[in-house]
Each structure stands twice: as structure tokens, then as C-alpha cells.
């Protein structure tokens, strides 16, 4: 078995919390492989291609990928080509606002928000 039953159940719980977001993502997808388990794929829809894949080794790693994608959406929305380290206060406020409903359902993963934000100068 790729994951213990407990690990698989926890990954599934995180996946369900982010399910709508995952379905709406255009730059990434989460797929199941019988060989390795969950894989986070960097994709493009127009033109169609698959770039890279990262193995989702735990519920925390899935939560990290989803929270990071939400932040990247904000950076894309503002048209700024940067990451957390150069984020302005309005971008940070919007990122935190978008994270809030997910972290409310997954409070044990709130530390991931801090890890992502620790990339700030």
C-alpha cells in the first residue's frame, strides 16, 4: 500500500476541503496513480501539455500545494510577477482572506501558512 490507511484518509480529507479549488485550477491538477499515489501535476490547458509532477507524500504536502496555488492566483490577479518575498500588504491581505475558509476547516495545517509567508524579506 502506498499510504497507510490513516495517511490516505487524511489526504482525502484535505482533498475534499480543497475539492472546488482543485477543480477550478488551470495550472495544476491532482491525479491518482496506482503506482505512486497522488501526484500534483503542473499543466497547461492552452496549449495542452503536462510539465512536471510532484508526489503528494502527505496531507500536509497537499495542503501546502493548494495554499501555494491560491497565493499564486493572487499574484497572477494583480499582474505582479513575484513571490511572497516581494508581496505588498494588499496582496498579503487578499491571500490570507482566501486561505481563511480552508484553514478554518483544517486548523492543524495553519502552520503551513506561516511557512509560506516566511519567505518574506
Regions found by a protein language model. Name each.
Residues 32-106:
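Acidic, low-complexity, intrinsically disordered interaction modules
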Residues 11, 15, 25, 99-102, ...:
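Long amphipathic alpha-helices with heptad-repeat character
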Residues 118-121:
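Short acidic DE-rich linear segments
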Residues 2-36:
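Negatively charged, low-complexity tracts enriched in Asp/Glu with abundant Ser/Thr
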Amino acid at each position: 500500500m502506498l499510504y497507510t490507511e490513516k495517511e490516505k484518509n487524511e489526504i482525502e480529507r484535505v482533498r475534499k476541503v480543497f475539492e472546488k479549488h482543485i477543480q477550478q485550477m488551470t495550472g495544476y491538477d491532482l491525479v491518482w496513480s496506482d503506482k505512486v499515489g497522488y501526484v500534483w501535476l503542473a499543466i497547461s490547458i492552452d496549449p495542452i501539455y503536462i510539465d512536471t509532477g510532484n508526489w503528494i507524500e502527505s496531507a500536509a504536502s497537499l495542503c501546502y500545494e493548494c495554499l501555494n496555488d491560491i497565493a499564486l492566483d493572487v499574484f497572477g490577479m494583480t499582474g505582479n510577477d513575484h513571490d511572497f518575498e516581494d508581496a505588498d500588504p494588499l496582496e498579503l491581505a487578499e491571500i490570507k482572506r482566501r486561505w481563511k475558509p480552508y484553514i478554518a476547516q483544517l486548523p492543524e495545517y495553519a502552520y503551513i501558512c506561516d511557512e509560506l509567508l516566511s519567505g518574506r524579506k
